[in-house]
Amino acid sequence: MNGAAPIIPDVRVEPDPSLVVRQLGRVAYEPTWRAMQAFAAQRSAGTADELWLLEHPPVYTLGQAGKREHLIAATDIPVVPIDRGGQITYHGPGQVVAYVLVDLRRRGYGIRELVARLEQAVIDLLAASNVEATRRAGAPGVYVDGAKIAALGLRVKHGCTYHGLAFNVDMDLEPFAAINPCGYPGMAVTQCRDLGLNWSVEQTERALTDALQRAIYS
């Protein structure tokens, strides 16, 4: 990309009354995961959906389909087996994580449709700054020139989701070299900074919140 770095789009939408947005800052992984589980277990038909925006300290998470052989190098970063779909991924500072706590029964669509909508939110956000992003058949997430910029993994219980997506903004990508990201040997990863997008975590959280709200509730 040439010239000045694009400014992150600031297109605000009216808050959906059935959505509570929480910006949690940098929080440890395991307590946040347990809080998601508790929220999903305790919510009722009238409970508002929630969107949690946050960062995690360095951690690998291993999904239900995960195999430890996809951790291919020794590391001091903890590995946490969890209950989302998918394989192994990395979370760390400078990555915006959006946990999507949505009642799909109220929305009237299923988990595959939600995954497509979450992917489209990231694709649209990048397109607004002239970055072309795509999906990849059989490998949920968002890619730029074949490199993964956003990972997705969800769990559904009683029609309600938790977990969500992780969007690489301005982070140390080196820990990805110790794993086969999402179980794919040799998969490249990228981030906004490397695409010439000098976005802060705070700016990205605001813009991603709006993009996700449009995608989920349209």
From Swiss-Prot:
Pathway: Protein modification; protein lipoylation via endogenous pathway; protein N(6)-(lipoyl)lysine from octanoyl-[acyl-carrier-protein]: step 1/2. It is found in: Cytoplasm. The active site is at residue 182. Its EC number is 2.3.1.181. Keywords: Acyltransferase, Cytoplasm, Transferase. CDD domains: LipB. Residues 45-218 form the BPL/LPL catalytic domain. Substrate binds at residues 84-91, 151-153, 164-166. InterPro entries: aa-tRNA-synth_II/BPL/LPL, BPL_LPL_catalytic, Octanoyltransferase, Octanoyltransferase_CS. It is an enzyme of class 2 (transferase). One of its GO terms (cellular component) is cytoplasm. One of its GO terms (biological process) is protein modification process. The keyword Coiled coil does not apply. One of its GO terms (molecular function) is lipoyl(octanoyl) transferase activity. The keyword Transmembrane helix does not apply. It catalyses: octanoyl-[ACP] + L-lysyl-[protein] = N(6)-octanoyl-L-lysyl-[protein] + holo-[ACP] + H(+). Belongs to the LipB family. Catalyzes the transfer of endogenously produced octanoic acid from octanoyl-acyl-carrier-protein onto the lipoyl domains of lipoate-dependent enzymes. Lipoyl-ACP can also act as a substrate although octanoyl-ACP is likely to be the physiological substrate. In the reaction, the free carboxyl group of octanoic acid is attached via an amide linkage to the epsilon-amino group of a specific lysine residue of lipoyl domains of lipoate-dependent enzymes. HAMAP family: LipB. This is Octanoyltransferase. It comes from Thiobacillus denitrificans (strain ATCC 25259 / T1). The gene is lipB.
